[in-house]
Each structure stands twice: as C-alpha cells, then as structure tokens.
C-alpha cells in the first residue's frame, strides 16, 4: 500500500481523509498532544486494523474522538450532568472522559468493557475530518505499541509508511 501524505493546508485534506475513514481505512491525524492513528470507531474491521498496525493488544481499549458535546449521547448513555459541564469547560482539548458505552460502540473499540473513552481534540483539521466522516474516530497514539509517542508526521512515517492509508501533515515543515 502507498501511504498518502495530505497537507492540512490543502483544502482537500479533510475530505480525502474523511473518505478514507468512511471506507474503513487508517489515517494518522494530529491532536493537540500527539498524532493519532484514526479509523471509524464504529466499524469493527477498521478498528482491528488499528490494533494490527500498532501491534497493540486488543484488550487495551481505544478513545473515540468526537466533534463536540452534542455527540456524547450518541455513543454513551447514563451520562452524568458533570460530564457535560466538564466537556463545556475543557473541550476541545486534552480531556478524556470514560462513560457508559451504548451498544452501537463495538466491543473491539471498548476491549469488551461497558465503558468508552471520549474526547474532542483541539485540532481544527481533525474535528473537520470527524465531521466530514460522520462517525467518531477511534484514535490511539500513532506510535508502534511500546515505542515513544509520535509527535510529528515524520515519526508516523517512520513507523507506518506503506502500512496505513494516509498521514495528515499538520505543518508543511512536517513533511515526511
């Protein structure tokens, strides 16, 4: 497989990445902390690709990235009011909440747990990709399991070139 390198400065970046996500592919996406390895969090086959690409144990649950507060109830239930207050105060940003999962969230995403982790990344391009894909994106850090976190597209390229569908380059100087 040839890995595409998509510049966040390109108007087609989000659309291309979202289409890859919608068709079950893997895209490395930027967050405010590290690059994530993203796939459709509701598509079991796509989620399994994340575990395979990372060499991640399947008993390690994934985080669902969403566009905002309005999506919490789509994937979670029995949500305490405090969760909405936290999301209002800290999203978008590096706050992850673990809440009871709806049945629509695959067991492979939650590692069989009754809960799911949700967060709203503070990256405009990543939220745009999530919105255009129309699904939450399961995205653990893009590093190979056990290796240091991937903070640049170059790190992602080193670990995954030819093994994932695309890398969204946050900065043009981040070119792999």
Question: PLM ranges: what are they?
Answer:
Residues 1-173:
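Active-site-adjacent structural elements in enzyme catalytic cores
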């Amino acid at each position: 497989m040839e890995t595409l390198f998509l510049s966040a400065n390109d108007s087609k970046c989000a659309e291309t990445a979202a289409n890859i996500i919608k068709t079950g592919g893997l895209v490395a996406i930027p967050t405010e902390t590290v690059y994530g390895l993203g796939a459709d969090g509701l598509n079991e086959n796509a989620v399994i690709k994340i575990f395979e690409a990372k060499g991640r144990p399947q008993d390690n649950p994934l985080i669902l990235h969403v566009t905002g507060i309005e999506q919490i109830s789509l994937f979670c239930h029995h949500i305490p009011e405090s969760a909405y207050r936290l999301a209002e105060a800290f999203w978008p940003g590096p706050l992850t909440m673990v809440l009871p999962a709806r049945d629509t969230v695959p067991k492979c995403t939650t590692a069989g747990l009754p809960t799911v982790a949700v967060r709203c990344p503070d990256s405009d391009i990543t939220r745009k990709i999530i919105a255009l894909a129309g699904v939450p994106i399961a995205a653990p850090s893009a590093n190979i399991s056990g290796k240091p976190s991937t903070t640049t597209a170059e790190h992602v390229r080193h670990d995954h070139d030819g093994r994932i569908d695309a890398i969204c380059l946050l900065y043009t100087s981040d070119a792999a």
